[in-house]
Design a protein with these regions (language model features):
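N-terminal maturation segment of proteins
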Residues: 17, 213-221, 268
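Conserved helix-loop functional segments at active or binding sites
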Residues: 89-93, 122, 152, 156-160, ...
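Catalytic glutamate of the conserved HExxH
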Residues: 145-149, 153, 157, 171
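C-terminal, non-catalytic "cap/extension" segments appended to globular domains
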Residues: 146, 154, 180, 186, ...
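Contiguous, non-catalytic segments that form substrate-binding/exosite surfaces or channel walls
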Residues: 1-131, 315, 319
């Protein structure tokens, strides 16, 4: 896969030059995404994530939380029970979408060794309906993965096939993860508390991990000519692993080859970071006032136009992700009862 990615970068650089771009990242950004922020706007954001969130990420990795979370196995029926209880409690368009999905069997979450390794939601025009595909790990993470794809499903169902931007689409999916945790009642209170801990740890991991992937990606596309080699890509990833705390949990210098988006959707991964922040704001609203986050989320799920995320957040009186890193860090400190010094460590 390494040589394949080298070829892809070279071909994309050639295409960028052919249409008049000096910078391949700028070309891919302009042609693929409707964003109101640009690569140069993210320099300070990445630095803040490194300073404020990486130390917390390292502390959580060392806490043993994941060993506890993944110890127990869960099956398809428990996964359905989780989302069903949450959707019914949330009501409105969410409940309607869930009934459509299950009533017409517009999902596949059964385990199989022959299934594609991954999860996704897609709108099937021949069925005039969305469809959810999940290759489960048969652990508690499946609850959140199913909710994630169901967020996309609900947005597509309510709009008849949404045309929202990448960032906004991920707000729908990650928002559903958070809201499902607030309203699900199955399988049990203990399991739901474990799922909430996992989601918060996963959210911290999204900030740090996806920011790290973006940092790697933008450096990779700066390599040209004889410098564009697998060895140099491995070296960049090794440095990124140190910068973002991956070396605290073990890593492989060629681990970047496992990130599908690098091959299929260049510069997509930063969308996970900024949309996760918007989704977390919904969760915080819900925690502060029961029903407030859900009410706004139900409105957002009916978004269908190609509107940039920052404009959408502002229109709903939510904050810009780029102004919240310190606040987010404090939320995680409280969640995981972490004590750090003034530098975030």
């Amino acid at each position: 896969l390494g040589p394949m990615f080298v070829d892809l970068i070279a071909q994309r650089q050639e295409l960028a030059a052919w249409v008049g771009y000096d910078d391949c990242e700028e070309f891919l950004w302009d042609w693929s995404y409707n964003r109101e922020y640009f690569p140069e706007d993210l320099d300070g954001y990445l630095q803040e994530i490194q300073q404020e969130l990486v130390p917390l990420f390292e502390a959580v990795q060392e806490s043993g939380l994941y060993d506890q979370v993944y110890r127990r196995r869960y099956g398809e029926q428990q996964c359905l029970a989780y989302l069903s209880s949450g959707a019914n409690a949330m009501g409105g368009g969410i409940q309607e979408a869930y009934e459509e999905m299950t009533g017409r069997a517009l999902y596949d979450i059964a385990p199989s060794a022959q299934k594609y390794e991954g999860s996704f939601e897609i709108y099937l025009t021949s069925y005039d309906a969305p469809f959810v595909f999940l290759n489960p790990y048969e652990d508690i993470s499946d609850f959140l993965s199913f909710a994630h794809e169901f967020g996309h499903f609900t947005n597509d169902y309510l709009t008849g096939g949404s045309y929202v931007t990448t960032d906004v689409a991920e707000l729908m999916s990650q928002g559903m993860e958070y809201m499902s945790l607030c309203y699900a009642t199955e399988p049990s209170a203990q399991v739901l508390d474990t799922a909430r801990q996992l989601k918060m740890a996963d959210s911290l991991g999204v900030y740090v991990g996806q920011a790290a992937y973006y940092s790697f990606e933008r450096q990779a596309y700066q390599l040209t000519g004889d410098d564009l080699t697998v060895e140099n890509l491995n070296a960049i990833y090794s440095q990124v692993a140190q910068d973002f705390g991956f070396d605290s949990v073990g890593w492989d210098e060629a681990g970047w080859t496992e990130i599908t988006h690098f091959f299929t959707n260049p510069f997509y991964v930063i969308s996970y970071v900024v949309s996760n922040d918007g989704a977390m704001q919904l969760y915080q609203m819900e925690q502060d006032e029961a029903g407030a986050g859900l009410e706004l989320f139900l409105e957002l799920l009916e978004t269908e136009e190609d509107i940039p995320l920052l404009t959408l957040l502002e229109s709903k009186e939510l904050e810009s992700p780029f102004e919240r890193v310190s606040q987010v860090a404090e939320t995680f400190r409280e969640e995981f009862d972490l004590v750090t010094d003034g530098a975030g460590r």
